[in-house]
């Protein structure tokens, strides 16, 4: 009945329900049916699905703003170049942005990608002035969409984040540890696009996640 109401196949409905169950938005009770998880409705920011940072800030109840700190060509770091499957002679590029919530430091992002992804050397000057989402720029240029990512989670003292103190003071960063995500972003065709170091002030953005249990009884 639901498939007919929405005009889609049963397979599509089943996949959508599986996705909602994986996110904890609905849960299934054997022999009883499928129910909405009321607790999930109160979650503002979750790890999956991943949303844009400005959207996270809005959902957390703040007004977002973004500062483009720097976009530059940097010396190749072979570990990062290998993760991005870059060409042997391809230039590595890094973009640094600061995200603010009601003018307070909320997150710092350092994104690495290959020069070929943004149109090569001749396009660099134009790109270096681009302040919107890097993923939107890549999509508009190449049609490549960031579809999924692989994340390693850690914590870090904000005063120890390499290179950040040249943009802001230690006092502005606060004293609480930041959540540190090392993220490799992939396209729909499983091609690595951007390697990101993301640092979150969890006094402002609080991540929540509903997890399924897999306990052997």
Where are these regions (language model features)?
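A generic "binding-loop/recognition-motif" signal
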Residues: 32, 53, 134
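Short, cationic-aromatic polyanion-contact patches
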Residues: 35-49
């Amino acid at each position: 009945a639901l498939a007919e109401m929405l005009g889609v196949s049963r397979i599509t409905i089943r996949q959508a329900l599986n996705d909602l169950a994986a996110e904890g938005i609905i849960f299934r009770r054997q022999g009883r049916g499928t129910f909405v998880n009321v607790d999930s409705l109160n979650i503002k920011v979750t790890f999956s699905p991943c949303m844009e940072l400005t959207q996270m800030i809005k959902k957390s109840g703040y007004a977002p703003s973004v500062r483009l700190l720097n976009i530059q060509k940097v010396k190749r770091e072979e570990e990062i170049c290998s993760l991005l499957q870059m060409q042997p002679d391809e230039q590595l590029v890094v973009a640094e942005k600061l995200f603010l919530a009601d003018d307070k430091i909320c997150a710092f992002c350092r994104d690495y990608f290959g020069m070929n992804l943004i149109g090569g050397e001749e396009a660099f000057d134009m790109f270096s002035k681009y302040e919107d989402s890097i993923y939107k720029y890549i999509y508009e240029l190449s049609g490549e969409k960031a579809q999924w990512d692989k994340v390693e989670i850690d914590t870090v003292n904000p005063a120890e984040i390499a290179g950040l103190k040249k943009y802001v003071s230690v006092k502005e960063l606060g004293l609480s540890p930041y959540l540190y995500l090392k993220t490799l972003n992939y396209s729909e065709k499983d091609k690595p696009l951007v390697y990101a170091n993301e640092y979150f002030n969890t006094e402002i953005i609080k991540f929540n996640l509903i997890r399924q249990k897999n306990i052997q009884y």
